[in-house]
Amino acid sequence: RGMWMPERVWEQSLTQNLAEAGIEYTVLDDFHFSSAGTTLDPLHGHFLTEDNGFVVNLFPGSERLRYLIPFGKPEQTIEHLRMIAEEEPDTVVVFGDDGEKFGTWPDTKEHVYDRGWLRQFFDMLSEQTGWLKTTTLADAVDHTPPQGTLYLPDASYREMTEWALPVERQQHLENLTDTFQNHSNWPRLRSFVRGGTWRNFKVKYPEANEMYARMMAISRRVEQAEEQGVAGTPLSAARKSLYRAQCNCSYWHGAFGGIYLPHLRNSVYQNLIDADRILDEAAGKTEPFIEASVDDYNFDARPEIRLGNDQLTCFLAPSSGGILYELDVRAISHNLLATLARRPEVYHPLVMQGETSAEEEVTSIHQRIVFKQKGLEQRLQYDARSRKSLIDHFLAKDTTLCDLARGDQTEHGDFATGPFLSRVRRNSDRIQVQMWKEGTAYGIPLKLTKGVTLSAGSPALKIAYLLEGLPLDRTVHFAVELNFAGLPAGNDDRYFHQEDRRLGPLETLLDLENIQEMGMIDEWLGIDVRWSANRPTHLWAHPVETVSQSESGFELVHQSVALLPHWIVEPDANGRWSVVMDVMLDVDPVSFTRTVAAELASH
């Protein structure tokens, strides 16, 4: 009869969806109700809400109880309930919150079970006779009248509306609350102070929008497959993978790791790629194929290009610097561009202050300050743009690897962002996406053309660059940024290699000269990412690591490996220069095992 709303997210149109599904009631936060402008204070009981003639009962869950249970002493909760009972003897007070608070969150098992909080709490509830009775939501709906009818604004719990704000606005809201929360008028004013809407996580974190847009495309594919007669196991398996990819944890960030956790993003993409592959097989696409399509795949009102075959799926954004923003390896259901940029967060000033003394008492998860590694304040670095591939840099000649790793490099061109023109060239077994832009570098007009070619049955991308209009009397420093996600650092079975020798684990900073090939192996994932070029190349590699907050504390998280081949470009007599690179994604078990064996034998 009732259901739990994930993250207590509410939009009024959900009323009809719930009612049509047979749902009679749900629990939201009292924050939702006060944001609607209700004059009832405190908020107890339940309310009716309606949409298109459909009616559902809504219970306001108490924020005060959310913070008392289980972090306050049991008697504090009893006294709070006693005060309410004295004012409203027959009212219903609702507590609804995460089960993780009772043993899963850090230190809560010891607090709730080992130190006896839960037993004390239940004993004290049982001891109260006459004035206090525990009940269910169903009984409350059946035996108590609604407080009235109310229409709620789009909302979630208070903290999530704050987390969804841009960092600057989030800080302003925190400052406002800190300034006025002890003011005598604050209880009357605070219902008019609220944050943003949860959907803006897709704006705050463009990577969340990428997952969301990809999920929506798969959702449409599942719907179309059903309309076209696909049924049975293929349809149910694809739908199951789609639903798994809709797990909300990966799409946002607050007091918990969320989108900052690579294994969550990887899991979303794994299930989306699984669904895509299942639907291809159901449609009879079992032989090598090649295809390309142009559509607004990320909901920015501009066209993106999907390039795919039986081995790989790529998404390119000509209007955003001509970047490659998704690269799916279908055999292992892995997106090598499930990256995350380094960006400011509202809690980073706390990180800058360094470690403080450990807390002795369990408090709300929202106020917990723990440093999981030393020196995190020195690891706060920010990116000017997304961490994707085919990002084109014109750099100062004295730019160093450390400059790149810190994000401190100076850009001397306008090719890393902005729109490129594009076209798709096709033949029977190969498709090339060409993108070009006439821009400037070092104040000089240049034309940059890049092409991405994929052939049927091939696990490799061929990437060609052509620079035109280069000055004959000077050289330029040109770099192409490639990022590879989901290859974790800090493990012996994930490493750089070149010509059958290891170059170090994936957190290694590499500054190599005059090379033409290098690889990255992840033995656990079962992939060898091999890069090569048709001319001698200087190459930088560095880890991309974020400092983020999770329920267990502040932590350093490896997000991706940045690979930057770079050249001091000397043009030909016509002011032209070119390079061709290959990115081979080898997941063949035989050749992969042979490569690993050769690596180990050499050591």
Which role fits each region the language model picked out?
Residues 409-449, 456-464, 468-471, 519-603:
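Beta-strand-rich recognition/accessory modules
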Residues 13, 35-36, 67-69, 103-105, ...:
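Short helix/loop capping segments that flank catalytic or ligand/cofactor-binding pockets
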Residues 459-462, 468-539:
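Polysaccharide-binding surfaces and accessory modules of carbohydrate-active proteins
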Residues 42-56, 60-64, 75-308, 312-321, ...:
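Active-site and substrate-binding clefts of carbohydrate-active enzymes
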Residues 4-9, 22, 29-32, 60-65, ...:
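Short, flexible loop/turn elements at secondary-structure junctions
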Residues 310-423, 436:
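Acidic-aromatic substrate-binding/catalytic surfaces of carbohydrate-active enzymes
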Residues 4-49, 104, 294-296, 308-310:
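Gly/Pro-rich turn-and-neighbor structural signature
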Residues 1-23, 416, 443-461, 471-482, ...:
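Phosphate/nucleotide-binding catalytic core
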